[in-house]
Amino acid sequence: MRVGVPPQIPRPSLNSAPSPFNPQGQSQITDPRQAQSPPPWSYDQSYPSYLSQMTSPSIHSTTPLSSTRGTGLPVITDVPRRISGASELGPFSDPRQFPSISSLTESRFSNPRMHYPATFTYTPPVTSGMS
C-alpha cells in the first residue's frame, strides 16, 4: 500500500482580511509626551574637562601629633602597660567561673551512648486491609 501526500489547500494570506489587531482606516495614536530637553552635560565631553571640575585631594599625614587624643584618653597601645597584673590574665583563670564544665568530664559518661535509653522495637498498629 502506498501512502501519498494529500494535496495542499492554498491558504489565504494573513493580511487579506482586516483583523481587530490591525485596524485599517484609523489614524496612528499620537504621543502625548513632549520631547525632553537635552541634559546640561554632554557625552561628547572629554575626560580632562571632567577632571578639571574636581578638586585635587588634600594629603594628610598619618603620624599622630601626640600619644593622647583630642579627648585626653590614652592611645590603645598605652593601655596594656597600665593594667595591673596584666601578665596574670588568661582565659578561664578562675575555676569558679564555669563550674558546670567539670561535670561534663565525669567518668559515668565514659561511653557517649550510655545516657541514652536502650534501643526499642517499634510495632506499627494493626489496621484492617485495604478497603
Swiss-Prot record:
<dbReference type="GO" id="GO:0005634">
    <property type="term" value="C:nucleus"/>
</dbReference>
<feature type="domain" description="Runt">
    <location>
        <begin position="1"/>
        <end position="10"/>
    </location>
</feature>
<keyword id="KW-0539">Nucleus</keyword>
<feature type="compositionally biased region" description="Polar residues">
    <location>
        <begin position="13"/>
        <end position="36"/>
    </location>
</feature>
<keyword id="KW-0804">Transcription</keyword>
<dbReference type="GO" id="GO:0005524">
    <property type="term" value="F:ATP binding"/>
</dbReference>
<feature type="modified residue" description="Asymmetric dimethylarginine">
    <location>
        <position position="11"/>
    </location>
</feature>
<dbReference type="GO" id="GO:0045944">
    <property type="term" value="P:positive regulation of transcription by RNA polymerase II"/>
</dbReference>
<keyword id="KW-0488">Methylation</keyword>
<comment type="subunit">
    <text>Heterodimer of an alpha and a beta subunit. The alpha subunit binds DNA as a monomer and through the Runt domain. DNA-binding is increased by heterodimerization. Interacts with XRCC6 (Ku70) and XRCC5 (Ku80). Interacts with CCNB1, KAT6A and KAT6B. Interacts with HIVEP3. Interacts with IFI204. Interaction with SATB2; the interaction results in enhanced DNA binding and transactivation by these transcription factors. Binds to HIPK3. Interacts with FOXO1 (via a C-terminal region); the interaction inhibits RUNX2 transcriptional activity towards BGLAP.</text>
</comment>
<dbReference type="InterPro" id="IPR000040">
    <property type="entry name" value="AML1_Runt"/>
</dbReference>
<protein>
    <recommendedName>
        <fullName>Runt-related transcription factor 2</fullName>
    </recommendedName>
</protein>
<dbReference type="GO" id="GO:0045669">
    <property type="term" value="P:positive regulation of osteoblast differentiation"/>
</dbReference>
<feature type="compositionally biased region" description="Polar residues">
    <location>
        <begin position="43"/>
        <end position="70"/>
    </location>
</feature>
<keyword id="KW-0238">DNA-binding</keyword>
<comment type="function">
    <text>Transcription factor involved in osteoblastic differentiation and skeletal morphogenesis. Essential for the maturation of osteoblasts and both intramembranous and endochondral ossification. CBF binds to the core site, 5'-PYGPYGGT-3', of a number of enhancers and promoters, including murine leukemia virus, polyomavirus enhancer, T-cell receptor enhancers, osteocalcin, osteopontin, bone sialoprotein, alpha 1(I) collagen, LCK, IL-3 and GM-CSF promoters. Inhibits KAT6B-dependent transcriptional activation.</text>
</comment>
<keyword id="KW-0963">Cytoplasm</keyword>
<dbReference type="InterPro" id="IPR027384">
    <property type="entry name" value="Runx_central_dom_sf"/>
</dbReference>
<feature type="region of interest" description="Disordered">
    <location>
        <begin position="1"/>
        <end position="75"/>
    </location>
</feature>
<keyword id="KW-0221">Differentiation</keyword>
<dbReference type="GO" id="GO:0003677">
    <property type="term" value="F:DNA binding"/>
</dbReference>
<dbReference type="GO" id="GO:0030154">
    <property type="term" value="P:cell differentiation"/>
</dbReference>
<dbReference type="GO" id="GO:0005737">
    <property type="term" value="C:cytoplasm"/>
</dbReference>
<keyword id="KW-0597">Phosphoprotein</keyword>
<keyword id="KW-0805">Transcription regulation</keyword>
